[in-house]
Amino acid sequence: SKLLPEVRKYLEEENAFTEENMRETKDLQKNLFKEIEGRIKLEDESLKFKDQRYEYWSKTTKEGNYTKYLRKKFGEDKVETYWDGDVEAKGKKFFNTGDIAVSNNDKILAYSIDDKGSEYFTIFVRNLSDGKIIEEPILETAGAVTWAYDDKSFFYSKLDKLHRPRQIFQH
């Protein structure tokens, strides 16, 4: 973690104080949580968009905590899950998806995740035909990925020590 020890200690003390003083409201908290959860649409699917040879969309399910990204070739019935947040998050204490970007030729996926809670995202590049990571991960980015039109590179930004996007890089 990037927290200073005195900040961490203060936050832990505040959390303990809150826990102690809110103990009597545990049942109310559970009921409120259930009510709010009941209003959330757990099964959802985005609109499909057409791009080159595929149509792309995303969906969430009751069973999962994270979004699945899907695609289907025009004229075919087979649906391909090209990125599954629940699979990616498995075994991690923290997981946040940054960006999911398929190359213009539909062959390569660049995506970013934060698995530490630091809000620094790591970018991975995956071959969609075999699912293998094909590049070294790019560390401490802002998370956004934009493919160049020629599919030979993409753009991303790095964060400075104050967590501000500082420079744009082409990879």
Regions found by a protein language model. Name each.
Residues 1-171:
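Beta-propeller folds
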